[in-house]
């Protein structure tokens, strides 16, 4: 009997040939690390440790405190990510130049817009309520609305992030006792690194928005104090900081003693002899000139 013929005469199974399954047991310490794709599938399903769900902070203070410190691997949200359902192409990016105030559609119907008359404004898909310049924006908040929805401003500040260099929180004070609410908002602005501006009416709030936009390209010289460069003006400014010493007294002292060195070393009697100065002004000036810079504890 030929064994080869017997094998040929056997009925062959229909369909593709079945594959043998090899089971490779793994010890507990040989479980592949997370993120590494194993070469073989284990017969046992290793238990994956459950990760604790990240709880979103409820206030801006918690949000600011829980952020990672600055470093090579630290990631800090900037607030530039578009919100859910928001088209990124419709969002005005920081640095985009515009001659108008860009108003968020969420401010539609705000009475403040009726008083923005001196500068143009238009609606646009932006993260803040008002974009006042290339690096300036504003969030509007009514204290009456804040008392009803205290979490609203926390969420807005989180979404805004650090998108703009100057971030203004424009608050309309429309309640009778605003002290406690303003105290909380002031702390929040310190944490958020934004400027708190108070307005007692919608008209005043509109003027603030107009002013920020109108002075967008103006230098800061208008806000800075003009300092005189000549010696007489600067010496007069220094001496008039003493209580009850005016510009006339300052000019008399400089004309009498000739220099600040002679004035500083003069006695109380010499100061009192100056015309128009008197003993009381002389005593105050002498005490200021001879007061130590550092207070010595007694």
Curated annotation (Swiss-Prot):
Cellular location(s): Nucleus
Cross-link (Glycyl lysine isopeptide (Lys-Gly) (interchain with G-Cter in SUMO2)): 21, 37, 243
Disordered as annotated region, ranges: 1-24, 66-99
Annotated region described as HhH2, dimerization with ERRC4/XPF, given as residue ranges: 220-298
A GO MF term: damaged DNA binding
Bias kind Polar residues: ranges: 87-99
Disulfide bonds: none
Modification N-acetylmethionine, positions: 1
Biased amino acid composition, Basic and acidic residues: 1-10
Residues spanned by motif Nuclear localization signal: 17-23
CDD domains, per database record: ERCC1_C-like (cd22325)
Keyword entries, A-Z: Acetylation, DNA damage, DNA repair, DNA-binding, Isopeptide bond, Nucleus, Ubl conjugation
GO process annotations (BP): cell development; cell population proliferation; chromosome organization; determination of adult lifespan; DNA damage response; DNA recombination; DNA repair; double-strand break repair
PTM summary: Ubiquitinated with both 'Lys-48' and 'Lys-63' linkages. Deubiquitinated by USP45.
Residue ranges of the annotated DNA-binding region, renumbered to this chain: 134-156
Gene Ontology annotations for the cellular component aspect, listed alphabetically: chromosome, telomeric region; ERCC4-ERCC1 complex; nucleoplasm; nucleotide-excision repair complex; nucleotide-excision repair factor 1 complex; nucleus
Family (UniProt): Belongs to the ERCC1/RAD10/SWI10 family.
Function: Non-catalytic component of a structure-specific DNA repair endonuclease responsible for the 5'-incision during DNA repair. Responsible, in conjunction with SLX4, for the first step in the repair of interstrand cross-links (ICL). Participates in the processing of anaphase bridge-generating DNA structures, which consist in incompletely processed DNA lesions arising during S or G2 phase, and can result in cytokinesis failure. Also required for homology-directed repair (HDR) of DNA double-strand breaks, in conjunction with SLX4.
Subunit structure as annotated in this protein's UniProt entry: Heterodimer composed of ERCC1 and ERRC4/XPF. Interacts with USP4.
Protein name stated in the entry: DNA excision repair protein ERCC-1
Species annotation: Mus musculus
